[in-house]
Swiss-Prot record:
Organism: Arabidopsis thaliana (Mouse-ear cress)
Record protein name field: Nardilysin-like
One Gene Ontology cellular component annotation held by this UniProt entry: cytosol
InterPro entries in the record: Metalloenz_LuxS/M16 (IPR011249), Pept_M16_N (IPR011765), Pept_M16_Zn_BS (IPR001431), Peptidase_M16 (IPR050626), Peptidase_M16_C (IPR007863), Peptidase_M16_M (IPR032632), PqqF-like_C_4 (IPR054734)
Family: Belongs to the peptidase M16 family.
Binding site for Zn(2+): 129, 133, 210
Catalytic activity field: Hydrolysis of polypeptides, preferably at -Xaa-|-Arg-Lys-, and less commonly at -Arg-|-Arg-Xaa-, in which Xaa is not Arg or Lys
Molecular function (Gene Ontology), one example: metal ion binding
Cofactor(s) the protein requires to work: Zn(2+)
Active site location: 132 (proton acceptor), 203
Acidic residues composition-biased segments: 52-95
Cofactor detail note: Binds 1 zinc ion per subunit.
Length: 1024
């Protein structure tokens, strides 16, 4: 190990919130590596730091150790998937964190290397991402491919990594006393990785499987089209994902791929380009000694970052691209190329413009286009990913989800956007708007909620590349300098000549389609008429409906803390108390005495009369709620800018309303919401738009095979779940008259169960309950009229199979989801949950190691407990574009048969590692008020009310021996056991043939019709 010392060490240089108790030190090693060391006193709240434990464990494999951020952009259009209604939110693997007396936090680290996909050689595209994968495949000191992740998994940790355009980030978290051992293994990524030839072929397949997850994603397809149609030779003009074709194809063309990644590694993986963050409970001196010792052997190198050559604009001006969508969507995507603005971070001119162009209040583009019936959502700004924020340019985007009529008005919409830009130029930059953003930024910084340690480490390591060290935390929040001239200069780039237009729609048809070569997506390139370009350049007028937003009424001024005691012993903290228990409502209350921030979270579950009694009622309720959200949007949006968030969702017959954030304005916002909800009746124009949006959502349901398999499983498990195709059919016939007739009945009887948690006194919580009483003068809904879901009880020895084809006819991925039904929860018992969680902890890595790393079945290989309306189960899931469901199920079955041997061979020390790691997870301290609220709320929603659930589960785990786990496995997973009850859901990709099932039908019950199956099934009593 290195005998190097740090060249410099700076304490108290990092600007941090006055509420942040952590200590920060910045050090620089002789090799140029810069490290931010963070001492978190809450990791060892008891004060004494025990000796670190380092074991040379050699079992297991990766948990979730790779993934490229630009490759996983899977959030596009999720709000239109229509899948949330069917997926049981009670089926949640994250149970309540116990409020025990030994709560602990994890330690973590992250390394950001200043090189990314922009440096891929043209002959081997995706190389930087491939290199990221290869660093997990063992090092000289720790040659086993799974050593790093095996160590983390055994000690309550996990890892991840992602490749961006100009940097690559690796990060992990681990149980606090194993930080040094984890750092030993982690540091070798950057000292002596093996990058073995025999591992390369497998990891090419892993990269290819990862690419196949993105293949049918419209956001990824659009991004790649934008790269492909950028100027030839420009760094944007590349394929950053990488796949088998780009990597194996390079080898077939004579490229030595290993030589390429070794060259890339040697050239850029050196201290001068590395930023390390380590978070631990040890002293800063101890953390510094570890970093110096373990990272001192990293190669020396210059701090000068790689320079990129780019001449001319990224895209041709005056062009419109029409991209055929996978989903039923209409999206107008506009981009303007700005100069790089990282050095102007204290002024944030791009955020000022994003605030106005993306605003949703009265007078905004969003409000205007919505009133026209052309748009359903609008967002604007410079994205956080590397392709939008680079040293070459900032790319300012505006994404507008269109209605059918909006699709026909694209040029008109763009015309109004340039009218709004003219308005902004005419009124000139407004300092009061900047001051609002400044106040909100400072407020958010001062009272920032703590993140999980590994996320925080990764964020700060990225920020070390972006900001001076003193602003690695504050840089994202700061609005320090008002510079109207810079804003005016920036607005000079918002011209038609500097604008790229993309339209993504399922409706695009043409005989002149071109093909983007990597994704195979179809697109058309068109010239925008010159007359339009000229009219956009100089609008003759600005519509009177467009104007600047009003001043924000929800920015708080009162930050006083309600908790009197300065330091409260965790042991003395009480659970939520029921302060109101009446036929109309039940209110739970807990004053926050832990985080002491001026925030509160108020959650409400509102049972509505007859909301789930039939598919028609269900749809009318959804229509009403979606129209109500539409009506509330301007108020809710304004509050969200001031960090006071609102969500409104449906779960069965229950409307869930959440209002959370800075507490001062919560009563005012709730009063406004309920006043509108009390009397709201929709109009025909908005009814048509919302109905169209819902229809599109149902058509887009289950386009992703993984979502589809989960949906099918829940469809068979839940007694009353309305099929999305049936809902689409019934929705088509519903009218506004149907809805207006239904609303009074829906609102006639309700029951509310609520939780008020945070910086609220008991009197304030009671006042919130009174807002409901005063606003909603309705009758209470009797308990017998509230819907309670029942779960199918599979018969003894059940071996069920459900086969369906993928919904998207171009989807190559197949999925097998194998579900084992265990038992319903027993009252006040945590034993089943404890065994399930421990079983998962033990088998997760061997499963990943066998089926993904060794057999390369696919990118998604996972398992875990499932809790469906308080009925326990366990799932194995594999998604593959390479193999069909029969083969996948066979390999999963083979692994399950081998589990008994795996458990038998597990030595006592390893078993104890897994058990103590699981206990550490359960007793991990909630990182934020919001996290604790969500834990408490899950107990209320499930009607369990065991607010110390995880503490009890941890205690239960201490009594569970290896023989208990083996016995439990034999009871529920061994095929000969009558209690082995399983359901295999198989979703068949477009390249597979379901006729394979004909040779695979022995001793199984094939379910052809879910309704018919449930009509003859037995059900467990409803528990929630």
């Amino acid at each position: 190990m290195s005998s190097m010392k740090s060249v410099s060490a700076l304490d108290n240089v990092v600007v941090k919130s006055p509420n942040d108790r952590r200590l920060y030190r910045v050090i620089e090693l002789e090799n140029g590596l810069c490290a931010l060391l963070i001492h978190d006193p809450d990791i060892y709240p008891e004060g004494s730091v025990p000796d670190q434990i380092d074991e040379d464990d050699e079992d297991g494999e990766e948990e979730d150790s790779d993934g490229s951020s630009e490759d996983d952009d899977d959030d596009e259009d999720d709000e239109e998937d229509g899948e949330g209604d069917e997926e049981d939110e009670d089926e949640d693997e994250d149970e309540v964190k116990g409020k025990g007396d030994h709560q602990t936090k994890k330690a973590a680290a992250a390394m950001c290397v200043s090189m990314g996909s922009f440096l891929d050689p043209p002959e081997a595209q995706g190389l930087a991402h491939f290199l990221e994968h290869m660093l997990f495949m063992g090092s000289t000191e720790f040659p086993d491919e799974n050593e790093y992740d095996s160590y983390l998994s055994k000690h309550g940790g996990s890892s991840n990594a992602y490749t961006e355009m100009e940097h690559t980030c690796y990060h992990f978290e681990v149980k606090r006393e194993f930080l040094q051992g984890a750092l030993k293994r982690f540091s070798q990524f950057f000292v002596a990785p093996l990058m073995k030839t025999e591992a390369m072929e497998r990891e090419v397949l892993a990269v290819d499987s990862e690419f196949n997850q993105a293949l049918q994603n419209d956001a990824c397809r659009l991004q790649q089209l934008q790269c492909y149609t950028s100027a030839k030779g420009h760094p944007f003009n590349r394929f950053a994902w990488g796949n088998k074709k780009s990597l194996s194809g390079a080898m077939e063309n004579g490229v030595d791929l290993r030589e390429c990644i070794v060259k890339l590694y040697k050239e850029y993986y050196h201290g001068g380009l590395m930023k390390l963050v380590v978070i631990g409970g040890e002293s800063l001196d101890m953390l510094e000694s570890w970093v110096v010792e373990l990272f001192g052997d990293v190669k020396n190198g210059s701090k000068i970052r790689p320079t990129l050559e780019a001449e001319g604009p990224i895209w041709k001006g005056g062009k419109l691209y029409r991209l055929e969508a996978v989903k039923d969507v209409h999206i107008l995507d506009l981009t303007w190329t700005l100069p790089p603005l990282r050095s102007a971070y204290v002024k944030k001119p791009e955020d000022y413009l994003a605030h106005l162009l993306g605003h949703e209040g009265r007078g905004s583009l969003h409000s205007f286009l919505k009133a026209k019936g052309w748009a359903t959502s609008l967002s604007a700004g410079v994205g956080d990913d590397g392709i939008n924020r680079s040293s070459l340019a900032y790319v300012f985007g505006m994404s507008i989800h269109l209605t059918d009529s909006g699709l026909e008005k694209i040029y008109d919409i763009i015309g109004y956007i340039y009218q709004y830009l003219k308005l902004l130029r005419d009124v000139s930059p407004q300092e009061w708007i900047f001051k609002e953003l400044q106040d909100i930024g400072n407020m958010d910084f001062r009272f920032a909620e703590e993140q999980p340690a590994d996320d925080y480490a990764a964020e700060l390591s990225e920020n070390m590349l972006a900001y001076p060290v003193e602003h690695v935390i504050y840089g994202d929040y700061v609005y320090q300098t008002w510079d109207p001239k810079l804003i005016e200069d920036l607005m000079g780039f918002f011209t038609p000549q500097n604008m790229r237009i993309d339209v993504v729609s399922k409706s695009i048809k043409s005989e002149e389609f071109q093909q983007e070569p990597w994704f195979g997506s179809s697109y058309i390139e068109e010239d925008v008429p010159l007359s339009l370009m000229e009219s956009w350049s100089n609008p003759s007028e600005v519509d009177n409906s467009l104007h600047l937003p009003s001043k924000n009424q929800f920015i708080p001024c009162d930050f006083s803390i309600r908790a009197i005691n300065s330091d409260v012993d965790p042991k003395s903290q009480s659970p939520p108390r029921c302060i109101i228990d009446e036929p109309f409502m039940k209110f739970w209350y807990k004053l926050d005495e832990t985080f002491k921030v001026p925030r509160a979270n108020t959650y409400f579950r509102i049972n509505l009369k007859g909301a789930y009694a039939s598919v028609k009622n269900c749809l009318l309720t959804e229509l009403y709620i979606n129209l109500l959200k539409d009506e509330l949007n301007e108020i809710i949006y304004q509050a969200s800018i001031a960090k006071l968030e609102t969500s409104l969702s449906m779960y069965g017959d229950k409307l869930e309303l959440k209002v959370y954030g800075f507490n001062e304005k919560i009563p005012a916002l709730l009063s406004k919401i309920l006043a509108i909800a009390k009397s709201f009746m929709p109009n025909l124009e908005r009814f048509k738009v919302i109905k169209e949006n819902m229809e599109r959502g149902f058509r887009n349901t289950n386009m992703k095979p993984l979502n589809h398999s989960t949906y099918l499983r829940l469809q068979l498990l839940c007694k009353r779940i309305y099929d999305s195709d049936e809902k689409l059919s019934v929705l088509n016939d519903l009218s506004l008259d149907d809805l207006n007739s239904f609303i009074p009945e829906l609102r006639s009887q309700i029951f509310i169960e609520a939780l008020c948690h945070g910086n609220l006194s008991e009197d304030e919580a009671v006042n919130i309950s009174n807002i409901f009483k005063d606003s909603l003068t309705v009758e209470p809904l009797p308990s017998k009229c509230r819907h309670g879901e029942q779960i199918t009880c599979f018969p003894m020895g059940a071996k069920l199979v459900r086969d369906v084809n993928v919904k998207n006819k171009s989807e190559t991925n197949s999925v097998v989801e194998l579900y084992y039904q265990i038992e319903p929860e027993e009252a006040q018992s945590t034993r089943t949950k404890a065994v399930l969680d421990l079983f998962h902890e033990i088998i997760e890595e061997p499963l990943f190691n066998q089926l993904r790393t060794k057999e390369q079945l696919g990118y998604v290989v996972e398992c875990g407990p499932r809790l469906t309306y308080r009925v326990h189960g366990f799932c194995f899931c594999v998604q593959s574009s390479k193999y069909g469901p029969v083969h996948l199920l066979g390999r999963v079955d083979n692994f399950i048969k081998d589990i008994e041997g795996l458990l038998e061979q597990l030595d006592d020390e390893s078993y104890e590692d897994y058990r103590s790691g699981m206990i550490a997870r359960l007793l991990e301290k909630d990182p934020s008020l919001l996290s604790e609220t969500n834990d408490l709320w899950s107990q209320i929603v499930d009607k369990r009310y065991m607010f110390d659930f995880s503490h009890k589960e941890a205690e239960e785990l201490r009594s569970i021996q290896k023989k208990d786990v083996i016995s439990w496995y034999k009871t529920y997973f061994r095929e000969s056991s009558p209690k082995c009850r399983r359901l295999a859901v198989r979703v068949w990709g477009c390249d597979t043939n379901m006729k394979e099932t004909q040779t695979d039908q022995k001793a199984v019950q094939v379910i052809a019709d879910a309704v018919a199956f449930k009509s003859t099934s037995k059900f467990y009593p409803s528990l929630c």
